[in-house]
Regions:
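Structured catalytic-domain cores with a bias toward divalent-metal coordination
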Residues: 1-175
């Protein structure tokens, strides 16, 4: 897609960012959401992403998946999704666009990411330690199957808002 003739703001931005992604070893990609759902960290399909997510420690939910049906995310690019590479990446959905807590989580996760990488001076860590409460125990979820809605007549059987956990395989969620 990036080498093709198509043009859009997103494609131009992706073409500009790609050389940076080729050069870096670690990536923290911060986002906010438009729908009400709990914050979550997308760790990718590999153990190294899950390990990095656990070192960062926030948010509580870690979701491992094989990527997005509409195209690769930055955290799925190149060495980040290569089990033989030491490169690792995380994407965090910090919460809703309009909520102050989303910005606070973005800042906290950045500090914790830098701390996990050993890039913060001990004096700074001491100052920052008092700003954040110890994180809650994290929960790891693995997406077993990605389903893409292909018909305009699709409807959910319940009012799902995001972050629901479907505990039993084969549970009807829509038709």
């Amino acid at each position: 897609v990036l080498k093709g003739d198509r043009d859009s703001v997103e494609l131009r931005r992706a073409r500009e960012v790609r050389p940076i992604l080729d050069d870096i070893d670690l990536l923290l990609d911060l986002h906010t959401m438009q729908h009400l759902a709990p914050p979550l960290m997308m760790s990718g399909r590999l153990a190294k992403g899950k390990d990095l997510a656990c070192k960062v420690g926030v948010p509580e939910r870690i979701v491992g998946d094989s990527g997005h049906a509409a195209g690769r995310r930055m955290r799925d690019y190149g060495g980040f999704d290569d089990p033989s590479s030491t490169k690792a990446a995380l994407m965090i959905e910090c919460g809703q666009h309009w909520k102050e807590a989303s910005g606070l989580l973005a800042k906290e996760s950045t500090v914790r990411f830098l701390e996990a990488m050993g890039t913060l001076e001990p004096e700074l860590l001491e100052l920052l330690e008092n700003l954040y409460v110890p994180p809650s125990a994290q929960q790891l979820f693995n997406v077993r199957e990605t389903v893409t809605i292909t018909q305009e007549t699709f409807t959910f059987v319940e009012n799902f808002v995001g972050g629901e956990i479907i505990r039993k395989a084969g549970t009807l969620i829509g038709h």
